[in-house]
Amino acid sequence: MEISQQVNGLLNEAIKTQASDLYFLPEGDEYLVKIRNANEVVVWDKIGYLQARRMMNYCKYIADMALSEQRRPQIGSMDWHFGDNQYFLRLSSVGNFTGLESLVIRIIYRLDDVHAAFFDEKQVQLISEMSRKRGLIVFSGPTGSGKTTTIYNLVNQMVSDQFVMTIEDPIEIREPRFLQLQVNHDAGMDYTDLIKVGLRHRPDVFIVGEIRDAMTAEAAIKAALSGHLVYTTVHAQDPVGVIDRLKQLGISDEFIAQALTGVAYQRLIPTTDGKQRAMLMGHGYSELVNMNTYDWGEWQDGLKTAVKAKLVTPETAQRFEFG
């Protein structure tokens, strides 16, 4: 089988499983081919060095990356067609300390191809109702917990005739109806700069990929205070931690109270059918402001309900009882 056919087959199989990433990773004198599905990374295959080298070179060639460079970091991208659908692939390569190259391929899906299943749709509705108030809605949860997918689906359901602008690093989902901007530090386009540009475009809704620093936090707060609906994510262990994180980034209690409409916490939890569902919990700012420690009671009740419905095992519920 030709190398092109091997790569095509591998990528198409990854897309069938809705994998987010495909990895070529050196291990001894072999390469591991791995795929990431939500929170789980599994070994797809083991291949020899020469076969891996040929497959990686083919990928790099069609992504317009330098074949001769195997140690320094490189990035590339390409469109990929499978069936009637088009996908966007983002490639990243780098060599390890022995000079063996690794390659990661991120698969960017269209919003129409990404579907989120929830344990409790009432929580989704709660956050949707919060969105009518405008202001800042912050999602928290570990990397790979489906936050961006949920945000995109929420916004897509409510904005049939509104102007939506996204600012991300990098773009994770393709949606042609949104104006999507990507952070580019080399070009002097960081989150803060793009939010300022975005305000001049006067969108109805902002999606800011992540608040990572004080300047981005301040810019997102200003956008929310100026009458926009702003969705974003923050790294925090629980919903109360979101408020603490904003304070750590220099946002005053007064501005948080004025701008923060709601907070959501989400995890993707394995189900008994071998798939995953999102456990989502939403809170208005007033529910959280006086909490010193987050009360996981409602979350744990949701897990108990899922166990009774035989959607998750008791062992899985115990593993996720504190988020």
Question: Where do the model's predicted regions map?
Answer:
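Short, flexible helix-loop junctions that flank or precede catalytic/ligand sites
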Residues: M1-G323
